[in-house]
Amino acid sequence: MTLRFPDLNGWLAWQETLNPKAIDLGLERVRRVWGRMGPAQLPFPVITVAGTNGKGSCVAMFEAIYRAAGYRTACYTSPHLLRYTERIRCDGEEVGEQALCEAFERVDRARGHGPEQVLLTFFEFGTLAALDLFLRWSPDVAILEVGLGGRLDAVNLIDPDVALITTIGRDHMAWLGEDLDAIALEKAGVMRPGRTAVIGSRVPPPALRARAVEIGAEVAQLGLEFDVHRVPDGWHWQAGGSAPLAMPSPALRGPFQLDNAAAVLMAVSVLAPRLPVSVNAMRQGLHRAHLAGRFQVFPGAPTLILDVAHNGQAAQALAETLRAFPCPGRRHAVLGVLRDKAVGEILEPLLPLFSTWDLGQSDDARALPVADLHAAVMAAIGAGVDPACVRAHASIAAALAAARARAGVGDCVVVFGSFTTVEVALRASADGTGVTP
């Protein structure tokens, strides 16, 4: 096969210039191209995961559980941290660059020629390539993570057998709406009539369940159709009138991960007639699931913690997890955010937890200028603070180095605010893996 570009970097750089709009929500373009590439529906079970926070964690748990049960998995997630190939995985392994380039070529040819050629966005190109690869891999189950919203996201091209919607918060409001009900309706777009929609929130916006009932979807909501019960050595999962199942604490750290795990187990149980999973495989999967950048801990002096929290809801979850994490010394924040984020909502739950703030600006064109971030942090902290406690740096790498330099042996350095911020710290780590003790 002759390729437009011989390497992955060439393909990705070109895709970023293909459509003048970085985000152009809608399904018409991907439907036209996919109609020339593959069947309307994939010939294996599909789980679609939507929501504001927790999507990646849920995908990681699905993957680990189904692999523990002996099934072949295919996963599509976004964004990536270190390598684009992280987005597309088969049986836990990243797609090879050559195979991905060939998939890109097939997508490119299916776009057509001349004035009728379809101008795909960067995300749409990757989504179609992932679906093309999944057809060739023929896994037992595919897990798809929505990129933005749900209703008009390219992933919604495929009808899921089960839709899981995690928590819903205020993020991407320029595209999804200003209030939670409006955002919920966009997420609800991944639901399908006659199929199960798992809602992984105890108190979702009312519009979410109402929409499920309106279209005739089967609803399973945390706290109603299924629930979790904490016990001293773990937790119990229970659906309907069934007997409670004892489960270990998820390997992914944070009190909210129990809700994510419960929602995942509910979806697994819905698909059990087609994909039976033993209780032991569920336990193994929850114990093995790992995801970079989600309260990822690098022990040392000081301890380094990486978390991609980038909105108010995720910042609140990070604050709760930090309070439960042993840190005998002081906490030092390394922060960089994107321009479209509500900085005040990110700062509010975290301000009381940190002694110092080192601020930086990533190379991402969407990054908030560090001078603006510094002003926001100073305003949030208020008068009387020692200016030396809040310092602005030219880069995330410089901010991280400064925080590490002033941290003591028992201290914790916490890097958060965006995927690109965490990427810098992850590249600077010893082996890029981290552990969660």
Which residues make up each language-model segment?
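Active-site-proximal loop/hinge segments that shape catalytic or ion-binding/gating pockets
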Residues: 418
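Short Gly/Thr/Asp-enriched flexible loops that form oxyanion-binding sites at enzyme active sites
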Residues: 62, 151-161, 426-429
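N-terminal leader/targeting and accessory segments in enzymes
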Residues: 1-53, 57-72, 81-83, 196-198, ...
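Beta-strand->loop->alpha-helix junctions that form or flank phosphate-binding loops
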Residues: 76, 198-201, 213-230, 251-254, ...
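Acidic, Mg2+-coordinating active-site environments of NTP-dependent enzymes
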Residues: 114, 118, 140-145, 160-248, ...
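ATP-dependent carboxylate-amine ligase catalytic core
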Residues: 7, 21-23, 27, 31-35, ...
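Nucleotide phosphate-binding/pyrophosphate-handling subdomain across enzymes
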Residues: 45, 141-146, 153-164, 168-170, ...
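C-terminal helical cap/extension that packs against the catalytic core
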Residues: 198, 202-220, 231-234, 303-306, ...
